[in-house]
UniProtKB/Swiss-Prot annotation:
Organism: Photobacterium profundum (strain SS9)
Similarity comment: family membership: Belongs to the universal ribosomal protein uL16 family.
Any Gene Ontology biological process: translation
Protein name, per record: Large ribosomal subunit protein uL16
CC annotations in GO: cytosolic large ribosomal subunit
Function (record text): Binds 23S rRNA and is also seen to make contacts with the A and possibly P site tRNAs.
Length: 136
């Protein structure tokens, strides 16, 4: 699963997920899966969607993952009183704003790409849409 090799700080503030996304255009492939909603994707969700796409296209073409989980989420164990510091890092998330391209694909027909992205979208907790690279 995806996570940073090393970070400057082990734990981060909760923060807010506001604003507009960077990476709103299909850059590498021909087809893309774009976020319509706002939320967080865990490393497990990113990997589950990638596997669903890869298996559907039977390893033909190429897939790019355009998001990376770089924010640690901490939690305290069950039945532990409050205080005594911040909990341990449990998992990593990528914060997603509307318009962000999550995955890209190339080298497969459009029908197959649509089906693969539809399978991937079912694994994700945010609303997404299928996009095609704009021809200049």
């Amino acid at each position: 699963m995806l996570q940073p090799k090393r970070t400057k700080f082990r734990k981060t503030f909760k923060g807010r997920n506001r604003g507009l996304a960077n990476g709103t255009d299909v850059s590498f492939g021909t087809f893309g899966l774009k976020a319509v909603g706002r939320g967080r994707l865990t490393a497990r969700q990113i990997e589950a969607a990638r596997r669903a796409m890869t298996r559907h296209v039977k390893r033909q073409g190429q897939i790019w993952i355009r998001v990376f989980p770089d924010k640690p989420i901490t939690s305290k164990p069950l039945e532990v009183r409050q205080g005594k510091g911040k909990g341990n890092v449990e998992y990593w998330v990528a914060q997603i704003q509307p318009g962000k391209v999550l995955y890209e694909m190339d080298g497969v027909p459009e029908v197959l790409a649509r089906e693969a992205f539809n399978l991937a979208a079912r694994k994700l907790p945010i609303k997404t849409t299928f996009v095609i690279k704009a021809v200049m």
